[in-house]
């Protein structure tokens, strides 16, 4: 227990603020320039406060001014040389541009080359930002264009972070010291680099920068899986920025220059053939949103349908007719291009859509030939032409089935098409390179297909020469039936590979159909599902191998017994057959579990229900072995069929959902890749015409040889120099046009973003800024009035603070100390040490208030106060705020005391019931009263049904009774009397006195009246509506009920009138003890009742002579006189 008491908790390590420091921070929070300037000047002279002190939330005065966006206060604090530390980072975080400029100017004055920046000197434990955060990084995180431009103009730089696999000394040391900080610093750096504003301001080519950064972030997301989501979000941000720039292109000329820009190529001129280098780069870096943008797609569509004007406006039937016509004529187009490539029909062949139709028609012809080969069309043709010759017909039927047979006419055509397909793939591999070639999955499929065809041709050649070699020793080697061939005969293997190649060739149609808007999205979904199937297949093979190994180990012996019973395999089959033990099904059953491969096949087909339990009825198998084998088979079926297959279905469904959500973007991206592949210069002729040498190819070969062998001549050198100068000029023109368009796009983008920011509705920050301006204006106005010689004690008293619930909360926490309570505190609101001395001056009053405020009005307490007044001999009281009663009114005072005694119990009983229902509100008030922060609690509610008639003013006559509660407190400074964190409230001293009927004592005094029909009715109403009765906030709910009951019994023929539940003071109240206060306006709003001066005098006046015409109850007037200030 002692250890817990002596433990220093984290919230106690902060140094406790003094009263003056709290006043200083509160003045800064409210925007009081004059008060803050006086305090700073005094602190500069006497150092009575620490101007760099922090509030319980760790904010210095400068940070509070930045949070409130008070530029004048920021300049004032900087002029008095407060520590800035990370104030620049805070101002950037708040996007306070003016403060950023002021702090940067201050930084230029105070920074030395050998020292650190101000934000680097802040403690890592208490600083809001990590050490790797610089002003430029933070501004980029906020994406504030204006602040980023200010920092870049002043020379701020943001270096590229090192690679994630970097092995330099700096990276190695950083990873060893703190790997988490090293990774987070890289993320912070990339988050800044991905800022659209920073890219627009610092890059000459923002689109290229966004592309490269997006690709780098994609790579990092695969390398650092722990931060994959963060990198993916930044990648998406870069893609959105590049797409947003594309939104602002207005003409086709701008779009063409943008998409055809090549940093190393010639300048693009309008009307030339588009090479679309920038768009190809976007496809390479997988910028799907950029490629699928409507502007890009419109340009691509215009290029795609360039050869067929009006094609898109035709109906579907006419479009089909045009496509079929061009497809049928593809040999004519191909031959025309070979013979005359620059003729009109040859140029038509170069149009992308015409080229696509010709290539598709060529591929459909190839598939038709494959179908003819699989159907052995030569046999049918032979049957047509040689139906009369049976010998010739048999020869033609047997020719394809013989070993080493020569290729048929259809197979020769297929070989020509395969040669053309291989040549086109070789040319593509030469143009784009191996890495780029392998990035496209369809290229991999084409490579596998062509490899199968090449292997088929090679095996056919091997089989042919093998048979020719055998015919030397056996002339009937080719007549051997197929069923007697060797199992691994090259002819059989070639047929298997050829059939597999046919499958891949047919699947290539899916790629061609991607141009269709209906089949294209399905093709994209299929490609995504293939990846899921491959992931699932890895797990499936693992389970399949595990159970296959187990079952083969368990059943291999009994499978061998079944094998011996098979007449086709066992040498004893004839003997077994004679004995009658031969089983024809044994030839099938023994293969089920004979080896690991056969067992694995058995389990695979079991997934489709093709294996039954009869396979476990082996020869000689025992009961336990059969049961154990069937149990393993059942477990495999549950795992594979119930679990894994449903998992595959769920994975494929998830993939389809992902694709369907962005099906349009995915399909347009895939279609754009296909379109651009036909925009290239080469590969114009389709297979098999592409293997025919053309005159253009011969001319290109001659030029290449001339350039290689004649490059050393003087003419070649002169031509080379001209080429260099021409390329330099072209590069200058290219860069000028591109940069001009890029500047326009960036300007439009920034303009639109600023308009979006300005068009946003009113936010909480805007409201807080208005509140801060009003608070600062109020403080400035009070200071002006004070300098003009006016009494501003009332106006500058407690005030309403900065305004608003949050500002009041900040001020309350500041004055209470919030989380810096001493260890010995047990209450909900701990007493503050520096105010404990104020308790010594008011011991008696604090004892009375210690339990509950209602004890102020007990009979004994009231009797003691009467005796004290009687002992004074009727003279004036020493207290200036407590006038004594004249001698002639002592009887009335004693009567009031007796009535208080009489009604005390009856009034306290219902009050105790009521206070239970309002325990929360009064508990808050009492706790707040303990720390002297009553001002924020007293103006929270207002009686909605009370009426204050300020026109009813009357002069009290002789004999009027007044109950006065006066309290004193130490002198308070700077007009923040109600916001101090004092631990006690000075207890009011109740005095019952009779006010004389002197005119001088009541000149200019107004009263508020309570209205009710009778004394008892008034008491009941006060009990029911005590929550709305205002005097209960100032003193105690019992006081008014007791006083009202007292007045009702003494003068039951007078009228009892009510006033507003909470009277507010006016600015012109004078502190004359001989007079009552002037009447106060009841129309004040709730914001005017935020706080009340605790050093006030409450006066209850009972005038038995001043009654209304129709009233039988006495008039009761109340007033509240402030000794140091009025209600703010």
Curated annotation (Swiss-Prot):
Similarity comment text for this entry: Belongs to the transient receptor (TC 1.A.4) family. STrpC subfamily.
Pfam (any one): Ank
Gene3D superfamilies: Ankyrin repeat-containing domain (1.25.40.20)
Gene Ontology biological process terms, A to Z: adult walking behavior; calcium ion transmembrane transport; calcium ion transport; detection of light stimulus involved in visual perception; monoatomic cation transport; neuromuscular process controlling posture; regulation of cytosolic calcium ion concentration; response to light stimulus
Gene Ontology molecular function terms on file: calcium channel activity; inositol 1,4,5 trisphosphate binding; mechanosensitive monoatomic ion channel activity; monoatomic cation channel activity; store-operated calcium channel activity
Originating gene: Trpgamma
Keywords annotated in UniProt: ANK repeat, Calcium, Calcium channel, Calcium transport, Cell membrane, Cell projection, Ion channel, Ion transport, Membrane, Repeat, Sensory transduction, Transmembrane, Transmembrane helix, Transport, Vision
Organism this protein belongs to: Drosophila melanogaster (Fruit fly)
Disordered: annotated segments: 865-898, 1064-1111
Role played: A light-sensitive calcium channel that is required for inositide-mediated Ca(2+) entry in the retina during phospholipase C (PLC)-mediated phototransduction. Forms a regulated cation channel when heteromultimerized with trpl.
Topology of the protein relative to the lipid bilayer: Multi-pass membrane protein
Subcellular location, record wording: Cell projection, Rhabdomere membrane
Descriptive protein name: Transient receptor potential-gamma protein
Keyword Cell inner membrane applies: no
GO cellular component, one term: plasma membrane
Subunit structure: Interacts preferentially with trpl and interacts to a lower extent with trp.
All ranges on the Extracellular side of the membrane: 347-403, 466-492, 557-629
ANK repeats: 57-86, 131-160
